[in-house]
Amino acid sequence: RDSSTSRGLGDVYKRQLYNTGELARDLRQSGYEFSTTTDTEVILYAYMHYGVDFVQKLNGIFAFAIWDDSKKQLLLYRDRVGIKPLFYSFVSGQLLFASEPKALFCFPGFTPRVSMDGMREVLAIGPARTMGNGIFDDVNEVLPGHYLIFSKNTMSDHTYWDLFRAPHTDSYEQTVETVSFLLRDSVTRQMVSDVPVCTFLSGGIDSSIVTAIACRYMEKHGETLNTFSFDFKDNDIYFKSNAFQPERDLPYVRIMLDHYHTNPVSYTHLRA
């Protein structure tokens, strides 16, 4: 196959993909040859082979852009639930995009202006917000599960993934097995790393499940998981139960550390 360079394709990104190997294998079977081990080649070849909706095949968190010189199009992609941010704006007829608004502000001629609607949301429902709305005027957001296509005179917004609701018909046993598989698959895919892996263990259900799966995975590979936990100074004296947090976290952290062999690091005297 023609290389991505000869096809006039370019890619800038901020992403972590968890199925790069699977995609590369499928593309090799279709005749593509890789000259590097980076996921950039995988992304560009997948775009060439499957078209703009290739993003549906990606498993991971990402925000990236592809320039297709043959079509004179720029495509901006964002992951399904918006883990990686991606913003864009127009200044004097020029398209700007970045993973943070402050990068847009560095462009000559861009003047940041606070959005009153955005400020109302910050004060009323922060840290939550309406998807796509921010505190700056003229700073737009690529929505989760969307990609945008920009050409010389047009812009189009496409949804490639969305939540859907359907009646739950599985038995209790089937549900347990399905949820267990999805959790284990999600965590173990993300354990592949060239730097040490750790978890933030708060004592809640989410972090405890992630820690349990990660710990077992690392034990199978002869390694020990690093965990980090914290508690506030005098929290044992001043903690008050509420609907959001009926109990302190620290006792559950200790239960997890007693049950699983990890390298724990605890900060128990932080000031609020």
What are the residue ranges of the model-derived segments?
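Cysteine-centered catalytic environments shared across enzyme families
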Residues: 1, 7, 11-267
